[in-house]
A protein has these predicted regions:
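Short beta-strand-centered aromatic/proline hotspots
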Residues: 16-23
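Compositionally biased alpha-helical segments
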Residues: 52-53
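A short macromolecule-binding patch
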Residues: 28-48
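Mixed-charge, Lys/Arg-rich low-complexity intrinsically disordered regions
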Residues: 1-14
């Protein structure tokens, strides 16, 4: 399992690159660069990889 923290840069299979804005238990709030939208995703199920912290 990967650990995530606010400020981490991630890449999502569908939404592309984004930045973690908040971690709440198993949920990650990620603001995606391409759309400018923030999405709430489950960290153990979302197709994301950490690029940098």
């Amino acid at each position: 399992k990967m650990a995530f923290a606010a400020g981490d840069t991630v890449d999502h299979k569908t939404f592309g690159r984004g930045r973690v804005t908040k971690v709440d238990g198993d949920s990650l709030y990620i603001k995606f660069a391409r759309t400018g939208q923030t999405k709430k995703l489950l960290k153990d199920y979302a197709p994301i990889v950490k690029i940098s912290s």
